[in-house]
Amino acid sequence: MFKVKCKLGRFAGHVDKFPCHFGYKIGDEFYYDGVEFSGRICPGLFASMMPIIHGTFLLGYKYTENIMFRYRGLDVKDPDMAKYDGAGYRPAYEVPGGLPEEFKQMGPPPPPNERAKTSHFTCGDTRILAEFTCEAVDLSDSDYAQPFYRRAISILEKIEAQPGINVDDILNKFTDFEKNEISPRLSPVLLEVLMEALVDMKYVEVREGKAYATGREPPSRPKIGQSEE
């Protein structure tokens, strides 16, 4: 589970002619950690933002990076190409002329060697269309996310204690009690999912099957096994 940042990237409509009644400015941000929002949130965003934030909170980068359409780039219709692609499109390498200015403001697709990490949503005011990016920026240590957060931190601490540990050996560093009696059970597949989260959030690097901590400090370090006072 992830801490989510939403940031106003642009107004896709005509904010020069119609005001944003919430007073948003480019660069304004708000956050969600699974329990609380922080920052100013216009009610005109609720309908569009909740599915995006929910998916990003649960899946992090995985919410967007495997959407194949994100890597398609620009196309133009070309029926002669149907014998190749089955649909009749041809890649375009620049924005066609004669389009409204807002189309020219659209950023290019991610480079072919980078996976998409952000999603987006817009406000309900079609005159201004405030467009926010949405991305996972950290593991969530909110109380709702604690069971999974603690599992992730326990894995990180095993890697910190033994830099260069083989990824396949990490699970064996936990006792039977630690693996099977603490919820959620630390199964091989859960460890794999948590490792991906640690890598995505830049806590861990994996090189040639070996894991190394990056030195990034997590938002908190729970004292696992000790009662809270």
For the regions a language model picked out, list residue spans one by one.
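Short, structured beta-strand/loop micro-motifs enriched in basic residues and often containing a Trp
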Residues: 2-15
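Short, Lys/Arg- and Gly-enriched loop/turn segments at beta-strand edges
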Residues: 37-48
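Long, low-complexity, charged/polar intrinsically disordered regions in eukaryotic proteins
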Residues: 105-147
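Short alpha-helical segments that sit at the start of domains
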Residues: 137-164
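Short acidic, hydrophobic short linear motifs in intrinsically disordered regions
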Residues: 164-183
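A short, conserved structural fragment
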Residues: 195, 199-209
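Short, cationic-aromatic polyanion-contact patches
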Residues: 206-229
